[in-house]
């Protein structure tokens, strides 16, 4: 199973990715959550850990690490996704609907859409449909919110997650927990 975590920029995808990874690791019988960072934004797992310990140092390191999103990078990332063979693979992609993400996402099987702007969700849904990705969750990233909301769990998980901020442990949030259980369930089918 290869799940793309996608949506517009600055929605909190990397924060959600880290929270999901931690939540899944605590679930009994869960497969190892192999994460592919397929966007050169400088926010691998190291960034989340560094941001929790020293936010200023993490920002400085990210600025030094950040690279341009070239076609060559996208081709390499697409190969990582294509060749991923574990039971569960989570792919964190960049926040643009473009040919580079099309190349990377074309090797995935499922999608989780996270958006801080509800008006951008239909475009991401259409992009995923074009790539034959099964959308398993559509989540509104409510930065100003104070609580998660679960609207539906089937056939598509829908709701919101609040305050996705770098350096915050979001692994125990209700939306993260429900999504983690859903991903574990789907990966064992």
Kindly label every feature range from the protein language model.
Residues 2, 88, 110-112:
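Structural motif
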Residues 2-26:
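Glycine-rich phosphate-binding P-loop
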Residues 26-46:
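Short beta-strand-centered segment that lines the nucleotide-binding/catalytic pocket of NTP-utilizing
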Residues 47-65:
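Conserved NTP-binding/hydrolysis module of P-loop NTPases
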Residues 60-65, 81-99:
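Switch II (G3) loop of P-loop NTPases
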Residues 64-75:
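Short glycine-rich substrate-engagement loop in P-loop NTPases that contacts/grips substrate
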Residues 95-171:
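Conserved catalytic-core segment of NTP-binding enzymes
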Residues 169-189:
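C-terminal end of P-loop GTPase domains and the immediately downstream helical coupling element
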